[in-house]
Amino acid sequence: MKKIQQLLMLSLISSTLIACGGGGGGGSTPTTSSSPQSSSPASTPSSASSSSIISSSSLSSSLSSSSLSSSSLSSSSASSVSSSSVAASEGNVVIEVDMANGWRGNASGSTSHSGITYSADGVTFAALGDGVGAVFDIARPTTLEDAVIAMVVNVSAEFKASEANLQIFAQLKEDWSKGEWDCLAASSELTADTDLTLTCTIDEDDDKFNQTARDVQVGIQAKGTPAGTITIKSVTITLAQEAYSANVDHLRDLAPSDFPIGVAVSNTDSATYNLLTNSREQAVVKKHFNHLTAGNIMKMSYMQPTEGNFNFTNADAFVDWATENNMTVHGHALVWHSDYQVPNFMKNWAGSAEDFLAALDTHITTIVDHYEAKGNLVSWDVVNEAIDDNSPANFRTTDSAFYVKSGNSSVYIERAFQTARAADPAVILYYNDYNIEQNNAKTTKMVDMVKDFQARSIPIDGVGFQMHVCMNYPSIANISAAMKKVVDLGLLVKITELDVAVNQPHCDAYPANKINPLTEAAQLAQKKRYCDVVKAYLDTVPVNQRGGISVWGTTDANTWLDGLYREQFEDEKISWPLLFDNNYNDKPALRGFADALIGTQCTNTH
């Protein structure tokens, strides 16, 4: 039987063990979570071997981080957990788990639990019975075989008096019989009201944790007839495997002709992945990018939720952060039809079409004026996704409040561009849309719109190709041809929202060709696809017409695609479309992007 090693903490260990800030630091108002979660009945070893003492200096040395910082491990579900820090040490990756997000109560069999409570001290649960504890998730494709879990815990005097034991465990989610149950700390090894570090090595004979298809539930539970409470002060997980490195120092520095290499980020729209508070997000953004797009907070419903009530606080903080870190900002988006992003006062407009257009003028002028004065915002998606997906394509009609309230007319599109130009003569104005890279009827409609604008002197500087593509569709030939049509119009071409979905319900013969788990072959194919797309951009768009390339997100754990296709994916998170994995580690896709920038041949090999 494995023994759990313990450390008597002489004092509260300093921040070398737990990074400050991130996806939820100490000092917040305590909250509770009591979501039930399935669990297999954990075995109860008859005895626990005595533990050796680890010195505080050796533990601090082995777990301290010299780089990177706080953020989240997995996606936005309540059952996912944030990671405060990840650091590489002697070939291993150390995950320091967020103690203010992502935990839940857990119980075996029919035993009930009362959830968990967050506090400045950590995560606390009441030991109501055998198998009651607290758990968090480690998201796929992280593998935990041979990983070492270290938990700093503090048991109450009542728990110590109950002579109950503590057990660290790990389970494959939705396959509850597969778990690590051999780590037990006997009551004799526990001291009341004293911080103790318990460690457990996940080491199963059948390597059941050497998998990437399932999330893993990690936790600690009381065994025996417990009473009292247990507080978990901190958790670190040291992974055995060395993280993949793309050997890219700074992606932004590889771009020819100094065009921007950008990324879309979350802000106050995502507490877990907020760039302003998540230091792991900050680390990867600072390392590789020089141009930022706010995923949501500069859209209309955030900026003017009610008529005349403009809210610049969150967007200003975002722009300020970009400025402080020498990054420019692309504004997204002044006008977008999506129902949840249109303020109710516009959706319910009862006045005339001209009054509605005047209200639109007010919104655009106020926003653009504000950021012209503030500085560092260099371009806007003026109108986003105004063309439908029909063949032949046309402007959106009944599904766009802007079309309907403008008198069942697309006049709002040109009006938006005219108003934005009047507000800021220097800012770059883009029309932005998806699927126009397919060189299809939608592309044709976009080109016709631009030609009409140019003929009538409606100001437009460029076209944003969102570029949400699959592994094989659309073809590089069609992507290049679509961009060439905009080049021939003399406009800037900007890839605004690039991602490459490993799985996508509408292409690559899904679900017949569904990929799960994420294999090395799939990652290398994605590497080549990123390279091919970026190379097509460089080959097609002249230097003076390049608006730059932005990726739509940092980590696979925070991609919009898994939410969009949740039903088709049957709640699996299997799109894996970005440059960094769930733990912010490099993926081969990053290498592929870099290869294209420096002119290296695109391959599906390392």
Swiss-Prot record:
The keyword Signal applies. SMART domains: Glyco_10 (SM00633). A lipid is attached at residue 20 (S-diacylglycerol cysteine). Residues 91-242 form the CBM15 domain. Gene3D superfamilies: Galactose-binding domain-like, Glycosidases. Its EC number is 3.2.1.8. Residues 1-19 form the signal peptide. The active site is at 385 (proton donor), 497 (nucleophile). Residues 23-64 are annotated as: Disordered. Disulfide bonds join 183-200. Pathway: Glycan degradation; xylan degradation. Endo-acting xylanase which specifically cleaves internal linkages on the xylan backbone, releasing xylooligosaccharides. Is able to hydrolyze oat spelt xylan, the arabinoxylans from wheat and rye, and glucuronoxylan. Also displays very low activity against xylooligosaccharides. During the xylan degradation process, Xyn10C may act on the soluble xylans and long xylooligosaccharides products released by the secreted xylanases Xyn11A, Xyn11B and Xyn10A. This is Endo-beta-1,4-xylanase Xyn10C.
